[in-house]
Amino acid sequence: MISAFDIFKIGIGPSSSHTVGPMNAGKSFIDRLESSGLLTATSHIVVDLYGSLSLTGKGHATDVAIIMGLAGNSPQDVVIDEIPAFIELVTRSGRLPVASGAHIVDFPVAKNIIFHPEMLPRHENGMRITAWKGQEELLSKTYYSVGGGFIVEEEHFGLSHDVETSVPYDFHSAGELLKMCDYNGLSISGLMMHNELALRSKAEIDAGFARIWQVMHDGIERGMNTEGVLPGPLNVPRRAVALRRQLVSSDNISNDPMNVIDWINMYALAVSEENAAGGRVVTAPTNGACGIIPAVLAYYDKFRRPVNERSIARYFLAAGAIGALYKMNASISGAEVGCQGEIGVACSMAAAGLTELLGGSPAQVCNAAEIAMEHNLGLTCDPVAGQVQIPCIERNAINAVKAVNAARMAMRRTSAPRVSLDKVIETMYETGKDMNDKYRETSRGGLAIKVVCG
């Protein structure tokens, strides 16, 4: 089973596959080096980046993330404000304190992080980290960042990464999920709660979801109150703060019956801009799509009913179930299947979560998820200048609104759907694999080569 807490992970921007994953890999490697008794013998460490990690690594802060991971930091607890000074110190000195300062290695950044445009054989996001004692190799590990902050060591690639604990309802498809819900008289969130209770206590579950929502809510607050220009060569101005100012001050806008769309846009822009600035966000299921799920829950909170502990849990459990299906049966990596695996999956998850809160049946929840993905099929991942900004930020806003629409369409539907969620997941994966790699997070095609920086 893939837990909802595997799908929703607290980390930092701008990318789950290119920032969170590499930081996790760096931390995993240095922990392995220390536990093997090889740390103090290490003179220097070399990092090789391959494929999409190389081609968009600079714009996604992959190099920074790996350095911070080797230093002993995890995405969920790294002190964001201390990163720039630490990177400057390492760059200037050519020395890297690793394992929380337990040892210092030679690390001339420009020489020891090597960018290779070619891909490793198993996945588009590959990296190899090697520890050396002079000319002697002490330890070398190859990692793949497979989306959503998940990393897989090469020797474990292709193996199941499900939680090994036995759960009462072990589903592997939407069809199985719906049958289990129907037979046991459970909602999707109810079934997921039974599974989560096999892994942790109710108090831990509630506290975990409360923490996830708090980080999302904090991202909205920061994003809609922060002026300025986002980092990087594109000089993209923050838009959420100006939109918020219009929404709270203009009677004309506030009386517009469509103003709810502007609020949803503002929520999504706020979180996505925080992500682009390297702020604290939640993979949902990725950083590139991290604005959609919080925006839809914020919409429900403001315009439908104030959220509480129970509704927050129901939303994340239902959305997490859908995210798990994509993770098991397709991909949530833009480098593997294009943006349909990030924005498309987030839209599908948010539509499912909202339908759950609106009182939809399990079938309606799955239909909302299917509608949302059906109209994201073929969506390319072509970040301009390798930044998670254009088209990513605006795309979050558009698809947050689309998720609400998909939920409403599913709730109002009176005819039986002709396309199942399982079929659209299968189609998404096949479509992504058929895409030219120019459109899979390499910045070699699409908008990425049409928009001029500056």
Swiss-Prot record:
Keywords: 4Fe-4S, Gluconeogenesis, Iron, Iron-sulfur, Lyase, Metal-binding. Signal peptide: none annotated. Pathway: Amino-acid degradation; L-threonine degradation via propanoate pathway. It catalyses: L-serine = pyruvate + NH4(+). Binds 1 [4Fe-4S] cluster. It holds the Pfam family SDH_beta. It is an enzyme of class 4 (lyase). Transmembrane segments: none annotated. Its cofactor is [4Fe-4S] cluster. The keyword Lipid biosynthesis does not apply. One of its GO terms (biological process) is L-threonine catabolic process to propionate. Gene3D superfamilies: D-3-phosphoglycerate dehydrogenase, domain 3. Its EC number is 4.3.1.17. One of its GO terms (molecular function) is L-serine ammonia-lyase activity. Belongs to the iron-sulfur dependent L-serine dehydratase family. This is L-serine dehydratase TdcG. It comes from Escherichia coli (strain K12). The lineage of its organism: Bacteria, Pseudomonadati, Pseudomonadota, Gammaproteobacteria, Enterobacterales. The gene is tdcG.
